[in-house]
């Protein structure tokens, strides 16, 4: 890897800024000052320091975000704030969200630059489960639980795969947990519409074995732990 690319990956500076940084003699490779941005380094073996602090290279990073309402699950948008905008600390890593969460929904979003893992997690063949907490306009009963279990026919004729509905409270505004392994557009909202009910609040709380860290306020984020990363990769 070129030294200027390494410095960018470690969030020291942009590649265009690297010449100025190197000119100041602030970067050392294996103890020697280097001022040539184009030299090749081995990011796994060479010791590179900036201001005498060792730079640690990580090819992939994995971020848990508690998405607020009004933010879109995209890498860029001309009108709305995106989930990537909320994690600008890692802008140099070119993160993208693993799947979608509707603009008006809140909760768990995982972002990474690991395209291979994203492909695995989003593959319909993998049946990766996602759990949501919902508030529903209308009373829920056992017939709704059975409908989720057997699959629900949406307005376009699509029959959803088996899911799970756990009723917390049944009232004019009911509360429940819903588990599905698909990600069709507005899927849960459309499933409840098919049951003559309306979703008034939706929060994703779990993807596979990764649970939303409840210490994160909306808009806050943290890196996944090694245990969480390994759990994601164990598909």
Regions flagged by a language model, labelled:
Residues 1-235:
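Basic, flexible Lys/Arg- and Gly-enriched helix-loop patches that mediate nucleic-acid binding at interfaces
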């Amino acid at each position: 890897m070129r030294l200027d690319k390494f410095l960018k990956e470690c969030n020291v500076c942009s590649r265009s800024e690297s010449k100025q940084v190197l000119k100041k003699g602030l970067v050392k490779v294996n103890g020697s000052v280097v001022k040539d941005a184009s030299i090749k380094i081995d990011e796994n073996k060479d010791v590179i320091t900036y201001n005498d602090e060792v730079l640690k290279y990580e090819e992939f990073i994995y971020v848990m975000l508690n998405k607020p309402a009004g933010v879109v699950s995209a890498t860029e948008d001309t009108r709305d704030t995106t989930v990537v905008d909320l994690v600008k600390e890692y802008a140099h890593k070119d993160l993208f969200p693993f799947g979608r969460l509707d603009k008006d929904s809140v909760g768990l979003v995982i972002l990474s630059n690991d395209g291979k893992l994203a492909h695995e997690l989003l593959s319909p063949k993998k049946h990766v489960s996602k759990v949501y907490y919902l508030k529903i306009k209308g009373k829920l009963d056992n017939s709704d639980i059975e409908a989720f279990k057997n699959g629900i026919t949406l307005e376009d004729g699509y029959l959803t795969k088996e899911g799970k509905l756990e009723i917390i409270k049944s009232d004019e505004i009911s509360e429940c947990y819903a588990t599905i392994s698909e990600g069709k557009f507005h899927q849960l909202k459309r499933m409840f519409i098919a049951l003559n009910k309306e979703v008034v609040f939706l929060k994703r709380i779990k993807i596979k074995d990764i649970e939303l860290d409840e210490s994160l306020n909306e808009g806050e984020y943290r890196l996944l732990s090694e245990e969480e990363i390994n759990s994601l990769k164990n598909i």
